[in-house]
Amino acid sequence: MTQETLRKLWITLAILTLVVMINIHGSTQKSDFALIIKLPIELKFDGELTREAYAVHGMRFFALFFWLVPFLAVYHAKRSSGSASEAFPFRLLDIEPRSRPGKWVQGIAFVVLICLPLLTAIHLWRIVVGMQVCQHVSNALVNCADIWSRPVNAGPWDDTYRLANWGPTYDPLVEPVLAVILTAVSVYLTLRLVIEMRRAGSRPVATGNTPAEPITTSVT
């Protein structure tokens, strides 16, 4: 895969992730603002969801998909050289990443596409940890406990547990542990990206293969 193809793949995934996270963040605040991207498939939540339900779905999306954004950026940075700004895969029109305006553009892109989703995840996580998991029995919620507990034994595929306020089906203990692990992976990859960008800045610019000198013969 060429660097150009990798950049196209990365920017597509990064923008889609940013849009979803911003929209979910707004939904937890009961905001009417939403970013819309026309796609062959439509991504939306049906029905009136509670603030807690949006937070749960947002953490699920973030944990499952966001780590790919810094992962691809790290892969791009490891194959780059010349400057740290060029190692970051964002490109805007014909602005040279090593130029002064280019460095500003790359810095802003890093904050928006990498840091902003991480901050949104913190916001969603604060909502999730404040909720309770309850057993759903005969139109009633019983045996409520925090998200790290399993009040009663339940099979992995049933509908035993729901979040408070008749939220989505939720597997306590398992889901928050997986979310913490995958979020930690995303944070690690983000830190690794910063390191690889600095390393790229210390590597000499790749100049490619120089053409061979023509072979001349003399006739005596």
UniProtKB/Swiss-Prot annotation:
Chief place where the protein resides: membrane
Lineage, top-rank taxon, reads Bacteria
Which GO cellular component does the record give, naming just one? plasma membrane
**Membrane among the record's keywords?**
yes
Membrane topology annotation: Multi-pass membrane protein
Transmembrane as a keyword of this entry, yes or no, is: yes
Kindly list the residue ranges recorded as spanning the membrane.
9-29, 54-74, 105-125, 177-197
Where in or outside the cell it occurs: the entry states: Cell membrane
Q: Cite the entry's keywords alphabetically.
A: Cell membrane, Membrane, Plasmid, Transmembrane, Transmembrane helix
Q: What is this protein called?
A: Uncharacterized protein y4fD
Identify the species of origin: Sinorhizobium fredii (strain NBRC 101917 / NGR234)
